[in-house]
């Protein structure tokens, strides 16, 4: 699994948008950083990571679940450390790698009431999907 990278503008506070970005399968951090740099220039704090190939298309969900948990745990920790626990939260899922993260968060109710990350779910103000309108399955995933 790739690392999780936090990037913040020089000035941020309780109302600064916090955007969690799950990158596409095969992305390099330098490519994903171009997107988060744009968000940072608009005044957003960002957290980014890329899910590994095996986890994306494994018939077992444990790797995808661990990736989603790790991303949300890092978001929770960063928001608390930065005094942004109540800031608006946006989730951005890019192509098949990112959309598998969304699928997993939804399947396991991670952000729902009673879910492991319900504290974050209460602050989600929007979700952005980039380049993955298809329902992800092991059969169509490699084609998307």
Where would I find each of the regions flagged by the language model?
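Flexible extramembrane linkers and terminal tails adjacent to transmembrane helices
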Residues: 84-86, 110-123
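Catalytic nucleophile-loop/oxyanion-hole region of alpha/beta-hydrolase
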Residues: 53-85
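Gly/Ser/Thr-rich loops at beta-strand to alpha-helix junctions
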Residues: 25-28, 93-100, 135
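Conserved alpha/beta-hydrolase fold motif
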Residues: 89-95, 127
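Short glycine-enriched nucleophile-adjacent loop
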Residues: 100-111
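Alpha-helical membrane-targeting segments
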Residues: 57-61, 135-144
């Amino acid at each position: 699994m790739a690392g999780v990278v936090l990037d913040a503008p020089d000035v941020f506070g309780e109302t600064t948008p916090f955007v969690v970005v799950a990158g596409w399968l095969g992305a390099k951090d330098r490519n994903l950083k171009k997107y988060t740099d744009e968000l940072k220039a608009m005044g957003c704090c960002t957290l980014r990571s890329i899910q590994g190939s095996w986890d994306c298309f494994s018939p077992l969900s444990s790797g995808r679940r661990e990736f989603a948990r790790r991303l949300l745990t890092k978001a929770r920790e960063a928001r608390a450390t930065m005094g942004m626990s109540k800031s608006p939260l946006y989730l951005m899922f890019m192509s098949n790698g990112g959309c598998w993260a969304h699928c997993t968060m939804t399947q396991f109710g991670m952000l729902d009431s009673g879910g492991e990350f319900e504290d974050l779910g209460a602050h989600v103000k929007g979700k952005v999907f980039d380049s993955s309108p298809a329902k992800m399955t092991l059969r169509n995933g490699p084609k998307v």
